[in-house]
Swiss-Prot record:
Belongs to the glycosyltransferase 9 family. It comes from Burkholderia thailandensis (strain ATCC 700388 / DSM 13276 / CCUG 48851 / CIP 106301 / E264). Residues 1-49 are annotated as: Disordered. Changing residue 324 to A: No effect on iron binding, localization and actin tail formation. It is found in: Cell inner membrane; Cytoplasm. GO terms for cellular component: cytoplasm; plasma membrane. This is Inactive autotransporter heptosyltransferase BimC. Induction: Induced upon infection of host cells (at protein level). Its main location: membrane. Changing residue 390 to S: Loss of iron binding. Enhances oligomerization. Loss of BimC and BimA polar localization. Loss of actin tail formation during infection of host cells. The gene is bimC. One of its GO terms (molecular function) is metal ion binding. Keywords: Cell inner membrane, Cell membrane, Cytoplasm, Iron, Membrane, Metal-binding.
């Protein structure tokens, strides 16, 4: 698999957005017909590299390393300076050299002509505008990814812009005044020195976007490897405009819903028994996942005894409820990530994911005697798009046993281990 591709037909060089443009200036949304934003929230790079070099060379790092060459006879070399690995060394004419690796690599570009060095550039984002794009459908995981974007900003001292859905911006912007936040349709790709995309990239066997698969290192830590920063997790700083306590008395939040059936805790009578346990201890139950009346499963037993937030409750309001809760009891999903982000103890009922998959919590509940961790097993062919997927035991009595065999007593013991809990 070649590490660098070369296209021999160079676009016509002309007036193109210069690096001096400030991506922090307000931008108006492009017309709907010209909005090239992908459904996942990723904006395509500018048609031509955005930075000007000597001898008519243009370059940037907005889709991996891109080097545009005018007419001439050039010797182009690209090197990964972290691993000291040569990636490309060839004599070419007019064209575009583009690396196949799109995640962060500290590229060195060297160009010779006529036996002399005419251009040299080592990646250096200090003081330069950098864009990090967050996949739109991964709101919870994006909270885990964001800490690595902050590490990238601090490591490279760049002018960071983060593109993400509006609910995430409302949650994160108050805590990070030195970072520019934009929704995907407001991205101006011609302004940036470098761009990186954080998301899940199924089928990326060439590791073009993610050098380490989420199944191996964790859904959030994969972003650390995409950005080349310390993989130790760090929750984001969440500053709420209204951080008052929503209830005077003690309460526990519950997030039992999931689009994936394998994520749900379907132990017969489990949620009802857990509700009685918490109520007897004096805790009110608040369903922060706004359970749908159209979904009938074991968690439906909570409908008549719990207070449920409205379906249109903003993320900032859900964060307020979670921050002041004694704990969240939930399954893997967006609201578990949100609880982690605001510092609430998370009793995470799991099974289909290995503990490496999500944030670290001492209150994870998993039964290792049951089938488990199929999401992390490449041979299991787990299908995220199939809401009823049980890759190992579909159609048998063992289907979804991973979470179902988590007992109420195991969850109770975990809850009692939380400091300050009176159960």
């Amino acid at each position: 698999m070649p590490k660098v591709t070369f296209s021999g037909s160079a676009p016509t060089l002309g007036v193109h957005a210069p690096p001096a443009l400030d991506p922090r200036q307000p931008a108006s949304p492009p017309p709907a017909a010209s909005n090239g934003t992908h459904a996942r929230g990723f904006s395509p790079p500018a048609d031509m590299p955005t930075w000007s070099g000597t001898e008519g060379v243009r370059f940037d790092f907005n889709d991996g390393c891109r080097v545009l060459l005018p007419d001439g006879d050039w010797t182009v070399r690209l090197r990964d300076m972290h691993t000291d690995t040569p990636l490309f060394d060839a004599q070419i004419g007019a064209g575009v050299v583009t690396s196949t690796r799109k995640h962060f690599v500290p590229f060195l570009i060297e160009i010779d002509a006529g036996g002399r060095r005419v251009f040299k550039h080592l990646f250096d984002a200090h003081g330069k505008p950098v864009l990090i794009q967050f996949e739109a459908q991964r709101l919870g995981e994006a909270l885990g990814w964001f800490g690595y974007a902050v590490k990238f900003q601090r490591q490279h001292r760049c002018k960071l812009t983060c593109s993400m859905p509006a609910p995430l911006i409302a949650l994160l912007r108050p805590g990070y005044p030195d970072i520019e936040f934009v929704t995907p349709e407001l991205v101006k790709p011609e302004c940036y020195y470098a761009t990186y995309r954080l998301g899940r990239f199924a089928g990326d066997e060439a590791h073009a976007y993610q050098p380490s698969a989420p199944q191996l290192v964790g859904a959030h830590r994969s972003a650390a490897y995409m950005l080349g920063v310390d993989p130790r997790e760090a929750p984001p700083r969440i500053e709420l405009t209204d951080d008052s306590r929503p209830l005077a008395g003690p309460y526990v939040c519950i997030a039992a819903q999931s689009a994936l059936r394998c994520a749900r805790w379907e132990r017969p009578g489990g949620w009802r028994e857990l509700q009685r346990f918490l109520t007897a201890a004096g805790y009110r139950i608040v369903c922060v996942d706004s359970p749908s009346p159209d979904v009938a499963d074991e968690s439906s037993a909570l409908a008549d005894v719990a207070y449920s937030l409205a379906p249109d409750t903003p993320w900032t309001e859900r964060a307020r409820w979670l921050r002041h809760a004694a704990c969240l009891i939930g399954v893997p999903g967006d609201l578990s990530w949100l609880a982690w982000a605001v510092g609430a103890p998370v009793v995470l009922i799991s099974g289909f994911t290995h503990p490496v998959s999500e944030f670290d919590t001492p209150y994870r509940v998993i039964n290792s005697h049951a089938c488990n961790s199929c999401w992390n097993d490449a041979s299991a062919n787990f299908d995220d798009a199939d809401a009823s997927s049980c890759p190992r035991h579909a159609g048998t009595l063992r289907q979804f046993e991973c979470a179902r065999l988590v007992s109420v007593e195991q969850i109770k013991r975990t809850i009692r281990s939380i400091p300050g809990i009176a159960c």
